[in-house]
Regions:
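Short C-terminal tail/terminal secondary-structure segment
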Residues: 73, 84-95
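A conserved structural motif in NAD(P)-dependent oxidoreductases
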Residues: 57-68, 79
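Conserved catalytic core of two-component sensor histidine kinases
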Residues: 6, 69
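Conserved SDR Rossmann-fold cofactor-binding beta-strand/turn motif
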Residues: 26-36, 76, 89-91
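Active-site helix of classical SDR
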Residues: 5, 13
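Alpha-helical segment proximal to the catalytic Tyr-Lys
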Residues: 18-22, 81
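A glycine/serine/threonine-rich, flexible loop-to-helix segment
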Residues: 22, 34-57
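Catalytic tyrosine of NAD(P)H-dependent dehydrogenase/reductases that use a Tyr as the general acid/base
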Residues: 2, 10
Length: 95
């Protein structure tokens, strides 16, 4: 169900961007990685999880809520005036 829901969000993003573009309404989606919220750290950040992050994430830092907020602010700003129909991945380079 998770993968299906993600695909639906991507499809909806593209369809709405196409439909609303003539009105200069931009539609994008953000795809966050494993954000270090208090809940994530309390419930799921185990030593094995830490190792997985170290092995799979290109950047050494941990993804913080502020990293996601900065992307949202960019998308809301005039700096992203020509960005639409896109998936903005904020995940520290997860591979």
């Amino acid at each position: 169900a998770y993968v299906t829901a993600k695909a639906a969000v991507y499809g909806m993003t593209r369809a709405l961007a196409r439909e609303l573009g003539p009105e200069r309404i931009r539609v994008n989606c953000m795809v966050p990685g494993w954000v270090m919220t208090e809940r994530q750290m309390r419930l799921w950040l185990t030593p094995a999880g830490e190792r997985q992050i170290e092995e799979r994430q290109c950047l050494p830092d941990r993804l913080q809520p502020s990293d996601i907020a900065r992307m949202a602010l960019f998308l809301a700003a005039d700096d992203s005036a020509m960005c639409t129909s896109q998936q903005f991945i904020v995940d520290g380079g997860w591979v």
